[in-house]
Structures are given as structure tokens and as C-alpha cells.
């Protein structure tokens, strides 16, 4: 755990005026003044017909931190830990957990948007410094944002320029040589233009000790820089806003250890990197035509990412001495029950055969060759265009409407080195061109000032072109079908401080083609997954209490899950990913979130999530049989490789290491399910 000391210095235009005053009175909680930026229509939090958690005022005291520090405050929101900062999110148990070089095209379940720019699976560049609002919407949001939000949406809104000149400087010190700084300056001009400049830096050694590199604490360091310039001009007819963002997160990556990081110690002799450099430009135009408003948004981004890691998790000396190491004893204890079950209750030594045979096998193994490293780089260019027509809600219309068209172009090239396609290749050079196009709308009827019925829809198609630059003959073109999503909602205010809503939504996650050219033909494709979401909830608030609670039920038809086959038990990198469809599934649960404010300086938060889920595989139960029981054997043969190695000590000894790779539920305790080496449901964590 890191300890922090913070210092904030306010900068006024005259450098002599006191620009901040505080009142001892308690500022009342209000939902009506909190605009929800991720909604199609302009609504406040108190009128939102969705299960959501919205952060705004509390972000002011978290400016030195990252979005990952908010995650525990959102019920039923999780993330996969296989990166230096969260990239892959799950909401209500549905979401992506990884995307290695050979895992196919991007297919996020939880959309992530920064100032109108889609950064799904690229969201590690989201520090909370100078952030106006963070919105997390739970459940199916495909009518709002398309297939990228089939499980939910995370929306970030940074502060706009203001009319007052001034700014502030923030610095924060912490343990492990953590040093964070931030600078904001706001500058209005006489011609009506306003400029806001923001800079933020965070450096830290990390908190893991690498004993192979001389007790080094910097193998998982963080070097993060974010720069932002925002220009705004508001007119009676046209409002223009331009946002330019540069982020460079150059972080080390040294997370995995055979003992599950029991003491935050790693043994890798070749630590990796987890970095992302992003350049983003966003142009927003708002045309106020009186009865109607026209919004036009254009976004362009370039993102260069690198993910690499020491995939044997150790070093030569570590593996040579692994048999007698204390960590091995602990590891044996951890898995003793499994070995005992597999070997009729014999003790751990008996499970691995006699000592002579163990020593012989141990001596024969070439530890010098047990050295693996994986790396993949991506260059990602995105372009988005969104044109939206909506009624002016300031006119208190009986009927409000929104209609729009949207298109995104996603271009990616990937260069990978290591064991690719389950060890069938040592390198990979590929590319994707993905075009998503949609038209959408929402119609809302306001019965009175207290209740609204709304119907929303979206028609969307996604076309994928895949290029294999190594000419393996695995190029493909997928012309996606048009899919329809809809949402019907009703919300009302039974009393002045109570809000109730209910909605039914249907969405989808798109079909695709598995990238691995060595898969059997029956495993090359998978179909759309259809979602049906029914949610009801309440919001209750007083001057010092805000409480929300919801109940949800979600059904899946053609549930997409990701299978993994470990092809070589002696090589922790020899695994192959592919997606398939289960028959159906469902989940239900509840989400509760609250804030209890005792004073302007003291408050208490509440976050409670509960979920139960079930997947029916039907005809897919024989999937393991079709693949020689490889997938099912992740729970048997690869947990105890006795069948493959006849009880040899190294067969089991290093299969214990393989067990760590194959069964990352243990790693999941520390890292929210590392995704690289286990058989798992893609979004059923």
C-alpha cells in the first residue's frame, strides 16, 4: 500500500488574490444539477433510466490518482490484471480479459470513451487529474454506443475552459519513490475563445521486488505523462470545442511469479514493458437552431502500444533450485489436495515417484532452455464521425427526440515475437481494417414533469478485413450483418427526492472469425451473441444522502466464450485461443451505491454488488473430447501432468509451474484473473 502526501498551490491571474473561499455549511446533494454526458438526450442524474455510478465532486480530492483507484467504488465492475493499468473491463461478469497478439480482432464488451473519443481497450491513459466527471453505466448499452458497450459503458469528461484566468499546481509524494505533479492553467481571450492547458506526470518504482536483478524495485515502474489542450468558443448559434491530448505511459511489467506473488517478489531475469503512447484530436460542434440542436463530433487518434513479459516467470538459478526451494514447498502445499486426489491420497513425494527417478529426471531437464519471452507491438489508428440531431430540451417539449448516424474506422498493425499460435510460429505480422457504421435514435414522451417513457434503437454493422503479412494464407474478409438493438424505459418521481425507473433492452455482441490458422475448420468462426437485459432501480437523495439500488436479470443466446488449449506442458507459452458459442446463459443480481455526507470535509461511501450466473453449453459439452480432452484437461492433466509424465518429478514439478499457468484462478486472487494461460469464458469471470 502506498502512502501519500499532497500539496496543492492555487495560481490566480494577479498572483495576489485569494481565489478560494470555504464555507462551514454543508453543501446539499443534488442530482438535478448533474448532467449525464453519456446519454443521447440531455438528462440529469435524477432522470437517468439506467443503473449507473457517477463521480464528479469527489474527483477533486482524487486528482493525483488514476481511474483504477475508483474501481472498488463501482459495484459489479472488475478488470483483468494482466497489464500495468486497467485495459480490459467486465461489468456484471461480462467483458474482455485480454487481447494477445493472436487473439483476433478487438472485441470489447465494456466501451470506454474519453471526451467523445472511443478508447475501448486503450483506456489505461485515464488519470483523474482535472477530470470533471466519470460515468459508469451498467448493463446492455448497445442502443447507446453500439456493440462495444454490450455489457456497459465508462465515460470520461474532462474540464472545459472557463471565463476566469487562473490555475493551480498539485504535487504528491508517496512511498516506493512515487512522485506525482499536475498543472492547470485557464486563459480566456478577448475574442471569446478560451484555452485550458493541463499537464500531469506520475513516476513510481512500483512495489514488487525483483530478486533476480539484485532486489530491484523498478522492474514494474511507472513513468506516465499526460498533456491536454482544450480550446472553446461559445456563440449564440455555434459552439466550437477542440481537444488535443498527448499521453505517454511507459511502464515496466513484471507481475508474474510461480509462487503467485506471495510476498510481492518476482524472479524474472528479463522483465517486460506495458506501454501506450496516444495522440488524440477531437473536434466538437454544436449548432443551436432554436427548436433543434445539431451536434457534430470528429475524433482522430494514433495509439502505439507495447506489451512484453518474461513468460517463464523465473531465471536459470531459480529453476535449477526450484525442487528444494521453500516456494516449492509452499506451492506443493497449495496444490497438495489436488495431487492427493489424483494419486489416491499419497503424499506429495509419492505423487512424483521415487527420489532416484526424480533426481534423474531433474538432472536430464535442460534448464538452460527453459527461458521464454513474449512481446507484441500494435500501431492503432482510429477515426470516428458522429452527426446527431436532437430537440432542444430547454423548450420543455412534450416529445423529445434524437436521431443520428455514426461511423468509425479502426486500422491496426501488430508485430509479435515469441510463441505464437500455440508455438506453431515464432513471429506474427498482421493487420486489421474494421469499419463500423450505424444509425440510431431515441424518442421520449414526457407525460408530465415527473415521468417519461422513452424508446431507443440502433442499427449497426461491422466489417472486418484481416491481413497476414507473413503470407500464411489466413487472410479473411468478414462482412458483418446489420444488427438491431433497442431499449424501452420508463422513469418517474413518486416524490420530490425519490426516482424510480425500469427498462428492457436487447443488444448483441458481434460474430467473428478466429485468427489462428491452425485451428480445425469447425473452430474458425463463431456467431453473434444476443443479450436481453431487464433492470429496475431507485435513487433516493436528501441534503446529505445519495443512495441508489437496482435489480437486474440478463439472458444470453449464443453466449460467446473463449477457450484456450495448452499444447505443450513444458512450454508455458504454447497455448492457443479461440472463441466459440455456448447455447445460452443468464445472470441476475443487484447493485447498490451510496454516499453519506457528514460535512463538506467528511463523507462515507457504500458500494455493494451481487451477481449469480449460469452458462448452458449444450452440444458444446463435448468440446474437450473434440480436441483430445486438451481443454478439459486444464483441470486434470495440466493440473497434474501425471498422465503425460508417469509421475516423473520434473514432469509434475514443472507441471506445478504449468499448473500456475494453466489455472490462473490462483493468480486471479492477486491479479483479477490473468488471461494469458488459462481456459476461461471470455466474459464470464
Outline where the language-model segments fall.
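N-terminal periplasmic "start-of-domain" segments of outer-membrane beta-barrel proteins
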Residues: 31-62, 87-90, 110
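N-terminal periplasmic accessory domains that precede
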Residues: 33, 70, 88-90, 133-136, ...
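Transmembrane beta-barrel wall of Gram-negative outer-membrane proteins
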Residues: 166-168, 173-204, 208-252, 277-283, ...
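Structural signature of Gram-negative outer-membrane beta-barrels, strongest in the C-terminal barrel
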Residues: 231-237, 389-392, 398-408, 430-556, ...
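Membrane-embedded beta-barrel scaffold of Gram-negative outer-membrane proteins
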Residues: 284-288, 293-311, 493, 499-505, ...
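Gram-negative outer-membrane beta-barrel transporters
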Residues: 446-453, 461, 553, 580-630, ...
Amino acid at each position: 500500500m502506498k502512502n501519500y502526501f499532497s500539496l496543492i498551490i492555487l495560481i490566480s491571474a494577479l498572483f495576489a488574490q485569494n481565489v478560494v473561499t470555504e464555507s462551514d455549511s454543508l453543501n446539499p446533494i443534488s442530482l438535478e444539477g448533474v448532467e449525464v454526458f453519456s446519454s443521447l438526450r440531455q438528462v440529469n442524474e435524477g432522470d437517468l433510466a439506467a443503473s449507473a455510478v457517477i463521480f464528479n465532486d469527489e474527483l477533486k480530492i482524487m486528482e493525483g490518482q488514476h481511474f483504477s483507484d475508483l474501481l472498488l467504488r463501482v459495484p459489479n465492475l472488475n478488470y483483468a490484471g494482466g497489464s500495468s493499468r486497467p485495459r480490459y473491463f467486465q461489468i456484471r461478469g461480462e467483458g474482455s480479459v485480454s487481447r494477445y497478439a493472436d487473439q483476433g480482432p478487438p472485441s470489447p464488451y465494456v466501451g470506454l470513451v474519453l471526451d467523445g473519443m472511443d478508447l475501448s481497450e486503450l483506456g489505461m491513459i485515464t488519470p483523474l487529474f482535472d477530470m470533471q466527471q466519470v460515468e459508469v453505466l451498467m448493463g446492455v448499452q448497445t442502443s447507446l454506443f453500439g456493440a462495444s458497450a454490450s455489457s456497459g459503458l465508462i465515460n470520461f469528461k474532462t474540464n472545459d475552459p472557463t471565463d476566469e484566468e487562473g490555475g493551480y499546481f498539485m504535487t504528491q509524494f508517496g512511498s516506493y519513490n512515487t512522485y506525482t505533479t499536475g498543472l492547470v492553467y485557464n486563459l480566456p481571450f478577448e475574442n471569446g475563445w478560451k484555452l485550458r492547458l493541463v499537464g500531469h506526470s506520475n513516476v513510481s518504482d512500483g512495489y514488487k521486488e525483483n530478486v533476480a536483478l539484485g532486489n530491484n524495485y523498478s522492474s514494474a515502474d511507472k513513468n506516465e505523462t499526460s498533456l491536454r489542450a482544450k480550446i472553446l468558443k461559445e456563440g449564440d448559434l455555434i459552439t466550437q470545442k477542440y481537444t488535443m491530448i498527448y499521453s505517454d505511459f511507459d511502464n515496466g511489467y513484471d507481475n508474474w511469479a510461480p509462487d503467485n506473488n506471495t510476498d510481492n517478489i518476482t524472479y524474472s531475469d528479463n522483465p517486460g514493458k506495458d506501454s501506450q503512447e496516444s495522440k488524440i484530436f477531437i473536434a466538437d460542434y454544436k449548432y443551436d437552431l432554436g427548436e433543434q440542436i445539431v451536434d457534430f463530433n470528429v475524433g482522430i487518434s494514433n495509439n502505439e502500444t507495447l506489451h512484453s513479459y518474461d513468460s517463464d516467470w523465473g531465471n536459470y538459478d531459480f529453476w535449477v533450485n526450484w525442487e528444494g526451494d521453500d516456494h516449492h514447498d509452499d506451492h506443493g502445499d497449495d496444490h497438495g489436495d489436488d495431487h492427493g486426489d489424483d494419486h489416491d491420497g499419497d503424499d506429495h513425494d509419492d505423487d512424483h515417484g521415487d527420489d532416484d527417478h526424480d533426481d534423474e529426471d531433474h538432472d536430464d531437464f535442460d534448464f538452460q532452455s527453459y527461458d521464454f519471452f513474449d512481446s507484441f507491438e500494435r500501431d492503432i489508428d482510429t477515426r470516428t464521425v458522429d452527426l446527431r440531431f436532437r430537440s432542444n430540451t430547454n423548450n420543455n417539449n412534450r416529445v423529445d427526440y434524437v436521431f443520428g448516424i455514426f461511423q468509425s474506422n479502426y486500422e491496426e498493425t501488430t508485430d509479435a515475437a515469441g510463441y505464437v499460435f500455440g508455438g506453431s510460429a515464432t513471429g506474427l505480422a498482421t493487420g486489421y481494417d474494421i469499419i463500423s457504421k450505424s444509425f440510431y435514435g431515441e424518442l421520449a414522451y414526457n407525460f408530465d414533469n415527473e415521468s417519461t417513457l422513452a424508446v431507443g434503437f440502433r442499427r449497426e454493422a461491422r466489417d472486418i478485413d484481416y491481413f497476414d503479412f507473413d503470407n500464411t494464407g489466413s487472410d479473411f474478409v468478414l462482412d458483418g450483418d446489420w444488427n438491431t438493438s433497442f431499449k424501452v424505459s420508463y422513469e418517474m418521481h413518486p416524490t420530490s427526492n425519490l426516482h424510480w425507473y425500469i427498462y428492457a433492452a436487447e443488444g448483441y455482441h458481434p460474430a467473428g472469425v478466429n485468427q489462428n490458422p491452425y485451428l480445425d475448420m469447425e473452430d474458425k468462426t463463431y456467431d453473434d451473441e444476443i443479450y436481453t437485459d431487464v433492470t429496475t432501480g431507485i435513487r433516493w437523495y436528501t441534503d446529505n444522502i445519495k443512495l441508489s439500488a437496482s435489480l437486474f436479470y440478463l439472458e444470453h443466446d449464443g453466449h460467446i466464450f473463449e477457450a484456450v488449449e495448452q499444447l505443450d506442458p513444458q512450454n508455458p507459452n504454447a497455448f492457443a485461443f479461440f472463441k466459440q458459442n455456448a447455447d445460452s446463459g443468464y445472470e441476475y443480481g443487484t447493485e447498490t451505491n451510496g454516499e453519506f455526507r457528514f460535512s463538506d470535509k467528511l463523507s462515507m461511501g457504500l458500494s455493494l454488488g451481487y451477481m449469480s450466473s449460469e452458462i448452458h453449453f449444450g452440444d458444446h459439452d463435448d468440446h474437450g473430447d473434440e480436441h483430445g480432452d486438451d481443454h478439459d484437461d486444464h483441470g486434470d492433466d495440466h493440473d497434474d501432468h501425471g498422465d503425460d509424465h508417469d509421475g516423473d518429478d520434473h514432469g509434475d514439478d514443472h507441471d506445478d509451474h504449468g499448473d500456475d499457468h494453466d489455472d490462473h484462478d490462483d493468480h486471479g486472487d492477486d491479479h483479477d484473473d490473468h488471461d494469458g494461460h488459462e481456459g476461461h469464458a471470455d466474459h464470464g469471470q
